Amino acid sequence: MTDTENVDEDRRVGRRSRVLKIAGLTLAGALVLGVATAGWAYWHLNSNIKSVDIDSALGTDRPAKAVTTPSAAASASAAPVPTGSLNILVLGSDSRSGKENKALGGGDSSGARSDTAMVVHIDAGRKKATIVSIPRDTLVTRPSCPLSSGGSTSVAYNAMFNTAYSVGGPVCAVKTVESITGVRMDHYIEIDFAGFAKLVNALGGVTVTTTQDIDDDDSHLHLKKGTHHLNGKQALALARTRHGIGDGSDLGRIGLQQMLVKALLTQISTHDLLTDPTKLYEVTDAVTDSLTTDTGLDSLSELISLGQSVKGLSADAVTTVTMPNVTAPSDPNRVVAKEPAASDLWESLR
């Protein structure tokens, strides 16, 4: 090989070396950026979640806790996947705090109450679930509840169920539910107006079928009988309407809420979120941004663990019922638990 050929070869080797070095640096930069982005996303979603230490506040004077057996975690970032039956109190808060909630809630309210209350029972195999709606107009004996500021609330007789949240927050809501059901709430999940609307929008809307016309000027919802694809604001209005259907009571509205829950489960099942990181982030961000949980679910890894344990749960495997009730003798606009049917229902969830 001549001197000229040697020089040309050295130049080619040098160029290849520079190209490989640039490619390596680019790849390394992309990897660092990807890891940093993933880390930021995890931190952001994790920091969205607000929590309340309900177990510490209520202590040991509670119904017995169901035994669960954790299985191996699916990944290092996820908590062990639990098995065994599970009872979760899910509340929809009518808080008007924040611009979005005030706009979606309509009007003004000096305090928040539980606008929707559901006890979600997941069976031991995590393949079936029963959702029991508790009418917010139910008259109950509200127990004394500890306050975060110190002291406690007084026992209240013939109190509306949804006042438990307004006087004592999540802790009192859980204690009241456990008092009237005799069932230990393993977890607590609360979502507000804005969070519900964002979730529906992140999923691309939700499809529902109404069996009658709905005309509610208060919620600005007007739907003809039939099938509709609703955006977040419309779905929230449907969940909250009570004057546009039936006799205007909370019982008619509960039926719509239960229909929406099953429709949302169906909508979620149409998305393969694990293979669509962008959609997964949108949905997770929408949920966690307006979420309050107990400390047992206050991290993304714990929520992922719960999600993995029920990933085989379909809308068809979910039964929705309302706590058996009758008109309250003291007030025709209120209801009380119908016995022994209500006690029998709660017993079946233990």
Annotate each predicted stretch with a short phrase.
Residues 2-350:
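Non-catalytic, solvent-exposed segments at the cell envelope interface
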